């Protein structure tokens, strides 16, 4: 598929692209060529070393991107992670929340959301413990609830936190620092004077413009 996106070599280049096109899944989106992994230069993709260890510049850029743009990051695209610019967030949020109303406070999702709102940002394992998901097999169940809240735009990733070794070097895959978008940017960041269906139509037409070879079915699946 011809997406006509330039090759990206840095976090700065990725930020400029996200600002320009508005939506960008991190990995496979179901639309050929439309992901950060597809767009970055080969040197910025995941690689393992013969002597052990790995490097993945794109993975390391995520925190810099969400902190410096800023933009929204979470599992927004068919339960997979990606970026949405602040320009497009009000329409995306307007549509998604019309499909997924705020959960009842006495539901599990409602408890997770109210816990996060009362404590402020928490890494995933801290939020899981605060909500009582500490038993065997609870991690995957909790992750499922989190994904639903991210798809509904009630929770986003504020940053990524990495453990440090004895030399104070970051290592590992890192942990998502979760927060609500309202706490991060205020309710004014959500102001949208369109109906949910008008927002949907605006997003659909925009994605058709930047992805001319994608089918309607592919774009509908991406929007959710």
Task: Say what each PLM segment does.
Residues 1-224:
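Long, low-complexity intrinsically disordered regions
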């Amino acid at each position: 598929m011809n997406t006509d996106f330039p090759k990206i070599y840095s976090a700065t280049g990725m930020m400029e692209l996200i600002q320009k096109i508005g939506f960008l899944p991190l990995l496979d989106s179901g639309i050929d060529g439309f992901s950060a992994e597809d767009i970055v230069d080969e040197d910025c993709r995941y690689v393992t070393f013969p002597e052990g260890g790995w490097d993945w510049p794109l993975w390391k850029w995520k925190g810099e991107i969400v902190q410096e743009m800023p933009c929204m990051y979470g599992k927004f695209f068919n339960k997979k992670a990606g970026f949405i610019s602040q320009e497009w967030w009000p329409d995306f949020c307007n549509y998604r929340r019309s499909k997924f109303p705020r959960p009842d406070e006495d539901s599990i999702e409602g408890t997770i959301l109210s816990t996060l709102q009362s404590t402020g940002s928490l890494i995933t394992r801290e939020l899981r413990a605060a909500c009582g998901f500490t038993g065997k097999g609870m991690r995957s169940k909790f992750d499922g609830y989190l994904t639903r809240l991210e798809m509904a735009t009630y929770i986003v990733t504020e940053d990524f936190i990495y453990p440090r070794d004895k030399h104070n070097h970051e290592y590992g895959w890192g942990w998502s620092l979760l927060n609500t978008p309202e706490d991060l940017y205020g309710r004014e960041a959500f102001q949208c004077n369109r109906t949910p269906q008008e927002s949907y139509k605006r997003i659909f037409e925009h994605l058709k413009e930047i992805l001319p070879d994608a089918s309607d079915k592919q774009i509908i699946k991406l929007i959710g």
